[in-house]
């Protein structure tokens, strides 16, 4: 990008008392390559969009989704009292994939888990 510094994407997963992921927050931009050619950013965006789409398409679980393109930030939260196992599987799948990307590119992607 020619800025002389590296930015990072931060992905924070929120875990409930049953040790299940019920929410995530993605902030920042990877800047792994020039705009329009950033495979890491595209990978994270695709994984996040796919996860949200799966919950909407394959479950009736209530959820909240906040997108702020100026920050940039995406927050997604399963909000119901009774969440389906399928939604939790989708969230775990996202976490596994993002963890893999972060292990391969630790200078560009940071993953954290918060119990709440």
Locate the predicted segments by residue.
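N-terminal intrinsically disordered, cationic/polar leader segments
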Residues: 4-39, 46-116
């Amino acid at each position: 990008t020619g800025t002389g510094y590296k930015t990072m994407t931060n992905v924070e997963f929120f875990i409930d008392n049953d040790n299940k992921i019920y929410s995530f927050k993605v902030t920042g931009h990877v800047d792994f390559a020039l705009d329009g050619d950033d495979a890491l950013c595209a990978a994270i965006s695709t994984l996040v969009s796919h996860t949200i789409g799966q919950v909407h398409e394959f479950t009736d679980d209530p959820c909240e989704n906040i997108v702020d393109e100026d920050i940039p930030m995406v927050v997604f939260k399963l909000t119901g009292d009774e969440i389906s196992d399928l939604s939790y599987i989708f969230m775990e799948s996202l976490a596994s994939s993002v963890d893999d990307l972060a292990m391969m590119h630790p200078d560009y992607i940071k993953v954290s888990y918060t119990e709440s």
